[in-house]
Curated annotation (Swiss-Prot):
The keyword Manganese does not apply. Residues 104-131 are annotated as: Disordered. This is NACHT, LRR and PYD domains-containing protein 5. It holds the Pfam family NOD2_WH. The lineage of its organism: Eukaryota, Metazoa, Chordata, Craniata, Vertebrata. PROSITE patterns: DAPIN, NACHT. Phosphorylated by PRKCE. Residues 1-97 form the Pyrin domain. Component of the subcortical maternal complex (SCMC), at least composed of NLRP5, KHDC3, OOEP, and TLE6. Within the complex, interacts with OOEP, KHDC3 and TLE6. The SCMC may facilitate translocation of its components between the nuclear and cytoplasmic compartments. As part of the SCMC interacts with the SCMC-associated protein ZBED3. As part of the SCMC interacts with the SCMC-associated protein CFL1/Cofilin-1. Interacts with PRKCE. Interacts with TUBB3 at cytoskeleton microtubules. The gene is NLRP5. One of its GO terms (biological process) is positive regulation of embryonic development. GO terms for cellular component: cell cortex; cortical granule; cytoplasm; cytoplasmic lattice; cytosol; germinal vesicle; Golgi apparatus; mitochondrion.
Length: 1098
């Protein structure tokens, strides 16, 4: 058992989120953050530091003054206020991860008035005779059911979890606080319940909590369900039915009492937060759930100690009920003990070694061997697989194959010779599988006589299953029966679906409802954590090897009915490329890895072209390698490789029998790199946000140099790869297929820049696009880069956004642009600290270099003076600029005048972005006069947040009507109102070329929807419309939906947040999409871009 550690990458992850914000967005974030800090006492910090902070220092500031989870929650709330849905979704996922980590690490909670201080801790005292009688009762109950060493010290030496458990109720040395609630949490089947029961036995033996507790009682959460009324005294009495003393005496000293509640994931914890419904009297009769919640919330017997067991999946719901708990994570057997139990000596050691060596990779098997019973199962399966040819074919070497080996051998008739199951025996097997499936779906793991009888498991059938060590009497007072381990129940539940392929067996729980058409619907089904492992077993069972063994056991063919449903699930997972790393995709890969069926896996992954995976464990690398190799049409891969833990299995493998070998973490990574570098169709590899060591980067780069590597685009945005970058530069020289490289957010030292530029100047380097945004570059770095521009025959695009290179650095770049061999076409210098003085050098470069077609200066304080200088070049008919981005450049009316004058002479400028400049209506009118000229070349114009009003809309309407080329106009965040929109609509009704119109947050209401609706039915070309953040209301939306559905409407992309409208309106929008399936209605309008997307505006 170990206490979880807060992930050290929280600060860096938050910094990465901030770096995704534009300059204006970042300032808005900081303003909202200061508002939040002034209202919240939980996260306060010096507000004056916020204004000066960049992304890195702001992330550090938040973590310095707030817990990691609170820093993420604060940021998530602000991202949602800013309508940044993608960032808020990612931040919410990160918040949950760090919240769970804090809970796990919090083994010493803050002192409250719940428990006594160190001075108040009850000291050792002699137990009375009645307590000793109870200890005898506990030892009689549990010692015959637990295979436990005689003394606690012996057990603790084999089970590391026991060490932390022995001191779970000790006071905190730093603050003196003694917890009265301890939570044991971990994955299912790891041995939490067994550990809790052993605790009772060791206490009874006097080895544990000596003198601290007079009584320790074990309650099962499933016994606290239902509406039946009882009292806490009655519950205790049932645990000691022949008590020689009244229960009142037992409960009279609650500070000497420990209550163990096992399996809290089975208890319904969505309890209304009304303390008035709870009770403090242990003699009062109430429904059992009320008693449970009263106990957990310390209303009932507040002085008693609680030890709770819960699966990780149920931990988040539980924490709201508890008062200052201590959380301890149960990890099961140590790796060394697992190895000893699995591969220890004995007469069959050679068989196990042979069977293990035949397997492809057994890390997942080792990971599941967390308790002795599973180790024994796997060990027996390895021995059986070591002597093939005895009746049943070997069902493979995966976890499913090993379980199938064990189960099929135990179920096979023990008659002389070998035969298949008889009809009666097949019926008993089906009944057992139905019982298991019923339990998995209903979270039921102990079955009474009625449950067994319903499924025909009585008498000889039940006796046979007990003899086979499959279904055993429950270890707690012998009530009911349970599978020998939870994983065995999950295996039989999966087998239930496979046996549907046997004629006449089609009833039971549907694996996936037939109406399921989306992954979102499926996620609601997969809430039960047991379904995850059941699903993996099911994929393993439909593999050819296991099916062959099963058909031999049954003596009849099994139709592959489950296979089609599994394919349907995989197809849903791959339906749409995710906006973030989806756990569903990685889980699908684990399932397919379990199948180990090449034909089936290739068919399942046939439609996958883009994947995004978060890889945290060595096994994640293995399953990803296996599946990515079989994604035949894969073109884009994003991998988040973060915090991969130390490979404990590989380290412990030195004690394995000679001749066996397990792959190290480095070897797993090398395999994955080999798959990526040799995939025939993969063109883009994105490792954004990953943390790669120098050795990991070296391995990757060596593989990327292979002749078979077809990757063209490498992305390391926000990745921690700087120590290994020197290996990347040589790769750029050797692999001429790599033409695009993005190192945004990677801190580059001067020596890194020098080495990179040497490679870029090499004649063999074919790099065409290089992004070095926010890399900490200096003017000296620009001098190195300028030499590349002057000599490279391939580099066409360079982005240096967010580097404070200043005027001096840009001067070096401009000098290089004037050199004849320079091939650069796209230059992005956003937020580089440029001033008006720089514009003279830029203008000079534009005059001499007609090959530069894209220029972005967004976020630089150019002002009117800078525009005056820049436009001297832009106005020339020889100027080759086609796309110019000047967002947030402090342009006003005067700047518009210079720009309008330049547009009169320029014949090539087709894209112009002026967002976040205070142009106001007079400046807009100046531009409109030029844009109405037939010779004006502008096609795309962005005017987001330019302080425009309805006064300029008449001019804009005339532009829409008269401009022969204008196709895109974005007016978001301008206060146009219904009047202004109505004026624009007059232009839309006329013959025009506009295909894209942005009206987000323009003050449109339901009153203006009638005019817009009429325009939509007339416009022949308008295909994309953004209406986000407008108060349209149900009435306005009803009017617009009529226009959306109109046959003459050509709309294909509509920006709307459907969830903000009532059900009636959402049904209308669904009707639109049913009538016109090609129409996309989404709040991600800016991602639904044409051609080269919004990148030119950066």
């Amino acid at each position: 058992m170990r206490e979880a550690k807060i992930a050290p990458l929280s600060n860096y992850g938050l910094q990465w989120c901030f770096e995704q914000l534009g300059k204006e967005e970042f300032q808005t974030f900081k303003a909202l953050l200061k508002e939040h800090a002034s209202e919240s006492a939980a996260c306060s910090f010096p507000l004056v530091q916020v204004d000066r902070a960049d992304a890195e220092s702001l992330a550090s500031l938040l973590h310095e003054h707030c817990r990691a989870s609170l820093a993420w929650k604060t940021s998530t709330d602000i991202f949602e206020k800013m309508s940044l849905s993608a960032l808020s979704e990612m931040a919410r996922d990160e918040m949950k991860k760090y919240l769970l980590a804090e809970i796990s690490e919090d083994s010493a909670p803050t002192k409250t008035d719940q428990g006594p201080s160190m001075k108040e801790v009850p000291g050792p005292r002699e137990d009375p005779q009645d307590s000793r009688d109870y200890r005898i009762h506990v030892m009689t109950t549990f010692s015959t059911r637990l295979d436990t060493p005689q003394r606690f010290e012996e057990f603790a030496s084999e089970c590391p979890d026991a060490h932390a458990l022995s001191g779970a109720f000790n006071p905190d040395p730093s603050g003196g606080f003694r917890p009265l609630t301890v939570v044991l949490h971990g994955p299912p089947g790891v041995g939490k319940s067994s550990l809790a029961r052993r605790l009772l036995l060791f206490w009874a033996q006097g080895d544990l909590y000596k003198g601290l507790f007079s009584y320790v009682f074990l309650l099962r959460a499933r016994d606290l369900q239902g509406s039946r009324e009882t009292s806490f005294a009655e519950l205790i009495s049932k645990e000691w039915p022949d008590a020689p003393v009244p229960v009142e005496k037992v409960l009279s000293q609650p500070e000497r009492l420990l209550i163990v509640v096992d399996g809290l994931e089975e208890l319904e914890l969505t309890f209304r937060d009304q303390d008035s419904s709870l009770l403090a009297d242990w003699a009062e009769r109430q429904p059992a759930p009320v008693l449970a919640h009263s106990l957990l919330k310390k209303v009932l017997l507040p002085e008693c100690a609680l030890l709770l067991t819960v699966q990780d999946a149920g931990l988040q719901r539980l924490q709201a009920l508890l008062r200052s708990p201590r959380y301890l994570w149960v990890g099961g057997l140590s790796v060394e003990n697992r190895m000893q139990l699995l591969l220890g000596g004995g007469k069959h050691c050679r068989r196990k070694t042979c069977a293990w060596h035949a397997g492809a990779d057994h890390q997942e098997v080792l990971d599941k061997c967390q308790v002795p019973v599973v180790c024994a199962l796997v060990r027996e399966a390895l021995e059986l697989q070591g002597e093939p040819g005895k009746g049943l074919p070997v069902p493979g070497h995966t976890l499913t194959g090993l379980y199938a080996t064990f189960v099929f051998q135990r179920l096979a008739p023990k008659d002389a010779g070998w035969r298949a199951l008889s009809g009666e025996e097949r019926g008993a097997l089906k009944g057992l599988c139905r019982l298991a499936a019923d339990g998995v779906w209903n979270a039921k793991f102990v079955f009474d006589g009625d449950d067994l009888g319903v499924h025909g498991l009585q008498g000889p059938e039940l006796s046979a299953l007990q003899q086979a060590s499959i279904l055993l009497p429950d270890g707690h007072c012998g009530r009911g029966h349970a599978f020998s381990h939870l994983s065995l129940q999950e295996f039989f539940a999966a087998l239930f679906y496979v046996l549907r392929g046997v004629e006449g067996d089609g009833e039971g729980y549907p694996l996936f409802p037939q109406s399921t058409k989306s992954l979102t619907e499926l996620r609601h089904i997969d809430l039960n954590v047991q379904l995850v492992q059941m699903k993996r077993f099911l994929f393993g069972l439909v593999s050819k090897e296991v099916m062959r063994a099963l058909e031999t056991l049954l003596g009849c063919p099994v139709r592959p009915v489950a296979k089609q449903q599994l394919l349907h699930w995989i197809c849903l997972v791959g339906q749409h490329p995710a906006a973030a790393a989806s756990p569903d995709l990685l889980e699908a890969f684990y399932c397919l890895f379990e199948a180990q069926d090449d034909e089936f896996v290739r068919l399942a992954l046939n439609g996958f072209q883009e994947v995004w995976l978060q890889l945290n464990r060595p096994m994640d690398l293995t399953v990803s390698s296996f599946c990515l190799r079989r994604c035949q049409h894969l073109r884009k891969v994003r991998l988040d490789v973060r915090g991969t833990p130390k490979d404990e299995f590989a380290e412990a493998w030195s004690g394995a029998p000679q001749g066996l070998k397990i792959k190290t973490l480095d070897e797993h990574w090398e395999d994955l790199c080999s798959v990526l570098s040799t995939h025939p169709n993969l063109r883009q590899l994105d490792l954004s946000g990953s943390v790669l060591s120098k050795e990991a980067m070296k391995t990757l780069c060596v593989k990327l140099r292979q002749p078979a590597c077809k990757i063209q685009n490498l992305i390391f945005k926000g990745a921690r790869v700087t120590p290994g970058l020197r290996h990347l530069w040589m790769t750029l020289i050797i692999n001429r297929n790599i033409t695009r490289l993005d190192l945004t957010g990677c801190r580059l030292r001067e020596e890194d820049v020098q080495t990179a530029c040497e490679a870029l100047r090499h004649p063999q380097c074919a790099l065409e696009s290089l992004r070095l945004d926010r890399c900490g570059l200096t003017p000296a770095s620009c001098r190195e880069i300028s030499q590349v521009l002057a000599t490279s025959g391939s580099l066409k695009s360079l982005s240096l956004t967010g580097n404070k290179v200043a005027d001096q650095g840009v001067k070096s770049l401009c000098d290089a642009l004037k050199v004849t061999p320079c091939t650069l076409q796209k230059l992005i210098l956003g937020s580089c600290g440029l001033t008006a003085a720089t514009c003279q050098d830029l203008a000079s470069a534009l005059i001499e270099n007609q090959g530069l077609t894209h220029l972005s200066l967004s976020g630089d304080e150019l002002g009117s003076k800078g525009m005056s200088l820049l436009c001297r070049a832009v106005k020339l008919s020889s100027c080759g600029l086609q796309k110019l981005a000047l967002n947030a450049c402090s342009l006003d009316v005067a700047g518009c005048g210079f720009l309008a004058f330049a547009l009169m002479g320029n014949r090539h400028l087709t894209h112009l972005s002026l967002s976040m400049n205070p142009l106001e209506d007079p400046g807009m009118n100046l531009l409109c006069e030029v844009m109405m000229e037939p010779s004006c070349p502008l096609r795309d114009l962005d005017l987001v947040n330019c302080r425009l009003t309805a006064s300029c809309c008449k001019s804009l309407s005339n532009v829409i009507t008269r401009s022969p080329r204008l196709r895109s106009l974005d007016l978001a965040a301008n206060a146009l109102g219904d009047e202004g929109i109505a004026a624009l609509c007059e232009g839309l009704k006329q013959k025009n070329t506009l295909t894209r119109l942005g009206l987000e947050a323009c003050g449109l209401t339901s009153e203006g929807c009638k005019a817009l609706s009429a325009a939509l039915t007339c416009s022949r070309h308008l295909a994309s419309l953004n209406l986000m953040r407008n108060d349209l209301g149900p009435r306005g939306m009803t009017t617009l939906c009529s226009a959306f559905m109109h046959p003459t409407s050509n709309l294909q992309t509509i920006g709307l947040w459907k969830e903000q409208y009532p059900a009636r309106v959402r049904r209308l929008l669904e009707q639109v999409q049913r009538l016109k399936p090609h129409v996309v209605i989404s709040d991600a309008w800016y991602t639904e871009e044409e051609e080269d997307g919004p990148c030119w505006r950066i």
